[in-house]
Amino acid sequence: MRVPLTALVYTEGDTDRPVVSAVMKAAGWSGSEFEVFALGGAANLEKRLRQQVAQESPIPRIFIMDSDGKCPVELRRRLMAQGSAATVVLRICHYEIESWILADDQGFSRFFTIPLAKVVSPDGRNAKERMLRCVDRLGRSNTQDFARRTARNDGYGFGSRYTILLRRFVDDEWRAERAAPRSNSLSRALLRLRELHERFARAG
């Protein structure tokens, strides 16, 4: 029996995986058609991309990374050289994957019981910091599970159960299709991943 090919999806960190999985499914990929790997930072992701960018393979390899304030066009030009393999795809979250999370303001509002008008904008830099501050300012006893102030009290970091709560939020409330109209980079990613899936399905 022929074993179906599985797309390899690479992202920067473990906390990105729930969102990336949801985006893949929204683009038409079933859970058995892809696997998401966290590479431990942007430098490692770029290294893996350089190793594979020109290697032909029937297996789709999808790289999803943050722009972190850099110009996405210049970033793509630097990382995706001419002659890139047809099954290598780079999608850039502008500015961070947390921008995609915040783009579904309705889902975010419901999950965290925040007035819709108080959900911070997905646009602009430091989306992660702004998202965590938004939740921390609720002042509830369980907000530290998702967001916490740093030891120096000069910023915000992930809470002790951030990944668990993020996965629950993504499963219960977050919808890529609803977020896409408020995030151009997410909208383009969904379109490109749908096209890749159609090609992948035809090849199978």
Language-model regions: role of each:
Residues 9-12:
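Short hydrophobic beta-strand that contains or immediately precedes a catalytic carboxylate
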Residues 38:
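Early extracytoplasmic/lumenal segment of secretory-pathway proteins
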